[in-house]
Amino acid sequence: EGFFEVAAKYYEWSGGKSFCAFDYLIQNVEYDMLASGHEPVYNDADWYDTSDPNLKASWMKFAVPLAKGHIVVSDKYANTQIMTGEVAAGVGSSAAINYYNDTVTYPDNTSEKMNLKVLPLPKTGSGEQFMPVTGTGFSAYKTTEAKAEAAAIFLRWLTEGERNLDFVVESGYMPVHDSAFEAIDGYEFPSPAHKELFSAVKTMRKEYTLTIRPEFTNYYNYVEALYPALKKLCPALQERADSGEDAALLAEETWDLFLEI
């Protein structure tokens, strides 16, 4: 709540710069739906049921500021646009913490020290909130009992309390053990930004509901078509919005694009 208002004020203050880049825009649309009390509906093609009015309602919350240029779809990962000063903020993966430079370098080759701040995901309303759990799991081939036991011992070793915290701090991942979360407050982090990240992770674990994306064969083919198409469309929409066209009508063009994916 208030996120898009801040983005609008930043756009005006900065003379037309986007406030935030989203790595996974459609996932944030989903979390808005869930927080508004609506489950996403999928079709047989592993994509969204676009006849669902709740999907469009949540999409349009993002589409209007997208059409105005207040937010953008990231260039793969938002940290790149943050490190070049293109945007002031990004919404993306916790693992991105390890891909930030110490400086922001602008297109004119001037630079300044980065003061990176990390916060929990923006919320929709005051009810139940949602967050993703994504990434890679461990698996082992069916093998001998001795090797299977060795694999299990290794996993228990890796996920033990403070060792688990050591590992996830280096990787930017989320802890998997209760004792690792309990150790966050007293842990010696490599940077203030890492400390803020894991404070945010701890807060979200307490206040947000974890969600796991359904396993769809074709889903990411749609996503990989959607984001480049949006990035191609939105600069022209931004120019038209700046020229006085109705942003709500321009946002409908992003929905038309969504329907074509």
What residue ranges belong to the model's regions?
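Active-site-proximal beta-strand/loop segments in catalytic clefts of secreted hydrolases
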Residues: 23-25, 93-94, 119-124
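Short, solvent-exposed loop/beta-turn-alpha elements that line the ligand-binding surface or hinge
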Residues: 38-57, 105-110, 123-129, 188-189
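Paired acidic/hydrophobic, glycine-rich loop segments that form the ligand-binding mouth/hinge
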Residues: 88-93, 99
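Short helices/loops that flank or line small-molecule/ion binding pockets
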Residues: 5-9, 76-90, 232-235
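Conserved C-terminal helix/tail region of periplasmic/extracytoplasmic solute-binding proteins
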Residues: 189-192, 196-261
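Extracytoplasmic/periplasmic substrate-recognition and gating elements
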Residues: 67-68, 106-179
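Glycine-centered hinge/linker elements that transmit conformational signals in sensory
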Residues: 4-11, 43-75, 121
